[in-house]
């Protein structure tokens, strides 16, 4: 998961601070998620998936396809 979170943020040219400001998720937690030191709780996964427009399965590296099935 850590690779997809970092990849998504970098693809959008976001800093952790700007992501914090847009999602309300603390920068320190974002850093830990990206480094694989913590796993985001379900509520945080939902926020990140909606923000990035990807599926939770993509965030969790369960699929290589970022598309959301609607």
Regions found by a protein language model. Give the residues of each.
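Recognition helix of helix-turn-helix/homeodomain-like DNA-binding domains
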Residues: 24-40
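Short, charged recognition helix plus adjacent turn
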Residues: 7, 11, 50, 60-70
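Short basic helix-loop element that most often maps to the first helix and adjoining turn
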Residues: 3-22, 47
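DNA major-groove recognition helix of helix-turn-helix/homeodomain DNA-binding modules
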Residues: 24, 43-58
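Short, basic-rich loop-to-helix N-cap that marks the start of a DNA-contacting helix
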Residues: 37-50, 66-68
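Conserved hydrophobic/aromatic packing and binding residues within compact polymer-binding modules
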Residues: 5, 19, 30-33, 59
